[in-house]
Amino acid sequence: MNICFLMGKIISEINFKFMIQGKNKSIAIFQIEVENKTIITVKGYDEIADYCYNQLQKDNYIIIMGILDYKGEIEITEIEQFTLK
């Protein structure tokens, strides 16, 4: 398990879906762009998916702690929104 910390800007719409089978009930998937212009796909499940869908939108800045999966995507374990001044 690889834990990572990322800070970036949301550059895509947040795609929210309900899941029929499996241990999770919902998923939110979106992309962020980090400081060096790398684009990373991130995803959150259940409560995190609800938070992402209801509280975040394109062009928001976020800080996340997550786990790198086998596809190179980040599964969010903690997320925080912030503003640049």
Residue map of PLM features:
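Single-stranded nucleic acid-binding surfaces, predominantly the OB-fold ssDNA-binding core
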Residues: 1-85
